From Swiss-Prot:
Its cofactor is pyridoxal 5'-phosphate. The modification N6-(pyridoxal phosphate)lysine is found at K265. It comes from Schizosaccharomyces pombe (strain 972 / ATCC 24843). Keywords: Mitochondrion, One-carbon metabolism, Pyridoxal phosphate, Transferase, Transit peptide. It catalyses: (6R)-5,10-methylene-5,6,7,8-tetrahydrofolate + glycine + H2O = (6S)-5,6,7,8-tetrahydrofolate + L-serine. It holds the Pfam family SHMT. Residues 1-20 form a transit peptide. Belongs to the SHMT family. It is an enzyme of class 2 (transferase). This is Serine hydroxymethyltransferase, mitochondrial. Interconversion of serine and glycine. One of its GO terms (cellular component) is mitochondrion. Its EC number is 2.1.2.1.
Length: 488
């Protein structure tokens, strides 16, 4: 035995140290900062940081999250695998991962003022569209029926969308989908026609929610409609969840069975999603016996193992931070400012003779109809981009093309985070008005050269350097936007 021990000792002593300890280069690879380790990627990040700081961000689904959220998002929680749910994982070593996820769930219920006896929440969905699919699949079988707001009328792809030729959204391949619409004259959801269609179509789920609808949804009316056809009411509050948490607009939770949301828009968290579900009694049978909700297990199973493997623990931890911030007085004031800024922006457009879909806004966004201005949203979006204003083209009721729509969607959450007030948004509208006029002028010049298609227009404009007006506006925006606070 002594001979064997000596043999083993001699064998280990002969192994070069680098076989069981990190070399200097290996340590450097693991510990070097990004700027040193990968200057190419670092340069891209720094360029994007400058772009964000020197731009006016008006995309309604974007925001600037806090330093604390960013710290959690880039933390060691990234390193851990944790398939399953707290207390029931398929991997060991999840004590603190469980703590973070449970904290996130608790804060989610608190942020939206929910009773844990009546509501539960899954915080593992990776993003909004998968969360919607996971919720649908929990309560629907393939080819069951679903209704959502039509995409050209302000809906979202994840609520189902088809053309006469084919299904565009995968949701419309899994399920039979029928859209409901807004009234083209008022821009408000046509609840009467929705009710008639729902009674005939008999959907299993009706989605209340939108990505480009500036008015409040009548959840009470939609609940009444779902009860007529024994459907679930699913509210997708992705855009407005921050406003709902702050209580500055009505909450869908009083009427909905299921509520989904992303976490990075008005909620100002990381890029993730949540699914809230009711618990307890859903209805009563003819004898008065309670019929219970059975959503918790179905939704949890649909998320994992149905559609996902391991959750993104760094995102869940960062979301817990954001939800904690959502309960503060400062967050409440922020959401009030988001609303007042949106109304100021809407009024400024109306004063300048612009047509707004629905005539104004009750939320964080404004949908501008450019039809009367003789130019489309795609061309205006491009010139705005060249002067460091980020917005997005958007369909308005009656549009036939999502690529060259007549609308422009504008939101206030991101710039409000940076400290823009009502007067600042009036100036923003002034800048946009200048861009609309400039775009029309440039497009007319392009048409004279036979460049009628949008791709021809983009080629004609190029990087904008040949147009002095673009250079002037860009310089003005960079100087002005750069003065505002930037959270990271």
């Amino acid at each position: 035995m002594a001979v064997l021990r000596q043999f083993v000792k001699n064998s280990y002593s002969s192994i070069p140290k680098r076989f069981y300890a990190l070399s200097a280069n290996q340590k450097k690879l693991l510990k070097a900062p990004l700027a040193e380790c990968d200057p190419t990627v670092y340069k891209i990040l720094e360029s994007e940081k400058s772009r964000q700081k020197e731009s006016i961000a008006l995309i309604a689904s974007e925001n600037f999250t806090s330093r604390a959220v960013m710290d959690a998002l880039g933390s060691i929680m990234q390193n851990k695998y944790s398939e399953g749910y707290p207390g029931a994982r398929y991997y060991g070593g999840n004590e603190f991962i469980d703590q973070a996820e449970r904290l996130c769930q608790t804060r989610a219920l608190e942020a939206f003022h929910l009773d844990g006896e009546k509501w539960g929440v899954n915080v593992q969905p990776h993003s909004g569209s998968p969360a919607n699919l996971q919720a649908y699949q929990a309560v629907m079988k393939p080819h069951d029926r679903l209704m959502g707001l039509d995409l050209p009328h302000g809906g979202h792809l994840s609520h189902g969308f088809s053309t006469p030729q084919k299904a565009i959204s995968a949701v419309s391949t899994y399920f039979s989908t029928m859209p409901y619409n807004v009234n083209k004259e008022t821009g408000i959801i046509d609840y009467d026609s929705l009710e008639k269609a729902a009674i005939q179509f008999r959907p299993k789920v009706i989605v209340a929610g939108a990505s480009a609808y500036a008015r409040l949804v009548d959840y009470k009316r939609m609940r009444k409609i779902t009860e007529m056809c024994n459907a679930y009411l699913l509210c997708d509050m992705a855009h407005i969840s921050g406003l709902v948490a702050a209580g500055v607009i009505p909450s869908p939770f009083e009427y909905a069975d299921i509520v989904t949301t992303t976490t990075h828009k008005s909620l100002r968290g990381p890029r993730g999603a949540m699914i809230f579900y009711r618990k307890g009694t859903r209805s009563h049978d003819k004898r008065g016996n309670p019929i219970l909700y059975e959503l918790e297990d179905k939704i949890n199973f649909s998320v994992f193992p149905g559609h996902q493997g391991g959750p993104h623990n760094h995102t869940i931890t960062a979301l817990a931070v954001a939800l904690g911030q959502a309960k503060t007085p400062e967050f409440y004031q922020y959401q009030k400012d988001v609303l007042s800024n949106a109304k100021a922006m809407a009024n400024a457009f109306i004063t300048r003779g612009y047509k707004l879909v629905s005539g104004g806004t009750d939320t964080h966004l404004v949908l501008v109809d450019l039809t009367d201005k003789g130019v489309d949203g795609a061309r205006v979006e491009r010139i705005l981009e060249l002067v460091n204003i980020s917005a997005n083209k958007n369909t308005v009721p009656g549009d036939k093309s999502a690529l060259i729509p007549r609308g422009l969607r504008l939101g206030t959450p991101a710039c409000t985070t940076r400290g823009f007030d009502e007067k600042d948004f009036e100036r923003v509208v002034e800048l946009i008005d200048e861009v609309v006029s400039l775009t029309k002028k440039i497009n007319e010049a392009a048409l004279k050269e036979g460049k009628s298609k949008f791709r021809d227009f983009k080629a004609y404009v190029g990087d904008g350097s040949k147009f002095s007006e673009i250079a002037k506006l860009k310089k003005e925006v960079i100087t002005w936007a750069g003065k505002f606070d930037f959270p990271v």
